[in-house]
Amino acid sequence: SNTKISVVIPVFNVGETIIDLLSNIPDYVDKIYLIDDCCPLGTGKIAENSKANTSRLTIIYNKKNLGVGGAVKVGYEKCLLEDSGIIVKIDGDNQMDPNQIKKIVDPIISNKDLDYCKGNRFLEMIEIENYPSIRFYGNIFLSFMSKLSSGYWDIYDPVNGFTAINSNILKKLNFDKIDDGYYFESDM
């Protein structure tokens, strides 16, 4: 496809993990925007000084901590300025496999009626078995609360941050109405 694909990665307290994530982002991704949200571990500098720093990587350093939603919105705005076609958001903690980007981008490319696609961390049973108990049960609770408040019962992992969005629909969103913090995922 000729669709320009960009990836936005908000980082805070990620550290060296970012190198593995950046190294595994597939070659068909045109641009990568890493948003260092005043990370005390210096994740932006770690990425900047690593072999993963290629010409497709742009590192943006926020002057103050904006929260995960605020950091993603900074990345989204940059992608819109650069005429990205589809924008993928993936967390910097390497919780999601960047090799799965194709699975959330392809439905948007192949179906002109589809503008947004959300990943599911719990699709594979092996992933659930390896998930820390506190995070697993916390996600169950947050997912239930999100479904209860939104009415979207068919979304299996509503607080998951692995998403793809068509830039044409992203341009229509009012970023002021989208949370700058953790509720960003639910607002989207």
Where are these regions (language model features)?
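A conserved acidic beta->alpha catalytic loop
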Residues: D36-K45
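Short hydrophobic beta-strand elements that form part
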Residues: S6-I9, Y33, Y61
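Acidic donor-binding loop at a coil-to-helix junction in glycosyltransferase catalytic cores
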Residues: Y182-M188
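Cell-envelope/extracellular polymer assembly enzymes that use nucleotide-activated donors
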Residues: K4-S6, K31, D187
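Short beta-strand-to-loop acidic/aromatic patch adjacent to the donor-nucleotide binding site
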Residues: S84-Q95
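Short, well-formed alpha-helical segments that are part of the catalytic scaffolds
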Residues: F12-D27
